């Protein structure tokens, strides 16, 4: 709701001051309201939630890698989590979250955005074959294995309206994850997809995302679809230290919510089959 037509931005055109769309100074805070609709097509259930995301500091991971820490109180209505990111001149790398999923732990670290942003630019974030899915979908007591690919695309710039206001030149990014789940009890594959469309405003960060997660029907069930939306209500952006400067290589954050998912690339499945994604 509230997003207009993509502006006339040519493919390959660089979006000026890309870093300014992803403020991540410690103390910056975003408040979102969210909605989830889930279930087979015939039985959709709606839930509402709130999430506050804030930049809390840095952490040194094993191996000496220093990452930024983003704390979310309830992203995607899944309880509190911390997410870890590192930025350099090439872009932003995601190092996972706490708590994270077994699947995510096998994928990180991976790049979530490239600098500078360019319209219609896509890149493959990960492509892993035959890894542990971390869940037993078919109920035979054995975790399934999965082939998983993630691709990110900068769609362009357009106007977006949310409770916090209207942002006329927001950057729209689409992240698509595709899973081919190999069922251990039968010689067949279940297909899952997670598509997140997110809008970022200059000087503000994430203002909205829409995420659709789908799992094809298994056996006699009707499959499962989950739609998650978060919209910005309030934001407080702290200024960067004067000595830090601002450039294409300055700190950027792809999603202030977490995935979500990475958070950005997690799939929610039917009740009882759902990895903890946030």
Question: Where in the sequence are the language-model features?
Answer:
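Signal peptide processing junction and immediate N-terminal pro/mature segment
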Residues: 1-10
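Conserved functional acidic sites
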Residues: 9-278
């Amino acid at each position: 709701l509230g997003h207009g037509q993509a502006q006339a931005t040519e493919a390959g055109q660089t979006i000026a001051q890309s870093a300014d769309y992803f403020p991540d100074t410690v103390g910056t805070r975003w408040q979102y309201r969210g909605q989830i609709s889930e279930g087979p097509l015939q039985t959709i259930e709606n839930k509402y939630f709130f999430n506050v995301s804030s930049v809390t500091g840095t952490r040194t991971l094993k191996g000496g890698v220093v990452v930024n820490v983003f704390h979310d109180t309830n992203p995607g209505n899944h309880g509190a989590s911390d997410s870890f990111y590192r930025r350099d001149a090439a872009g932003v790398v995601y190092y996972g979250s706490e708590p994270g999923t077994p699947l995510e732990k096998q994928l990180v670290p991976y790049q979530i955005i490239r600098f500078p942003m360019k319209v219609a630019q896509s890149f493959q974030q990960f492509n892993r074959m035959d890894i542990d899915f971390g869940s037993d979908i078919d109920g035979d007591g054995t975790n399934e294995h999965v082939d998983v690919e993630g691709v990110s695309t900068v769609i362009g710039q357009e106007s977006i309206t949310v409770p916090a206001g209207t942002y006329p030149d927001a950057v729209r990014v689409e992240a698509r994850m595709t899973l081919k789940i190999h069922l251990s009890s039968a010689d067949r594959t279940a297909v899952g997809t997670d598509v997140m469309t997110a809008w970022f405003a200059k000087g503000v960060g994430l203002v909205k995302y829409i995420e659709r997660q789908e799992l094809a029907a298994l056996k006699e069930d009707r499959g499962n679809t989950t739609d998650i939306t978060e919209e910005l209500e309030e934001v407080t952006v702290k200024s960067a230290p004067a000595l830090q400067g601002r450039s294409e290589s300055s700190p950027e954050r792809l999603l202030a919510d977490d995935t979500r998912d990475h958070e950005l690339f997690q799939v929610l499945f039917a009740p009882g089959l759902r990895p903890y994604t946030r």
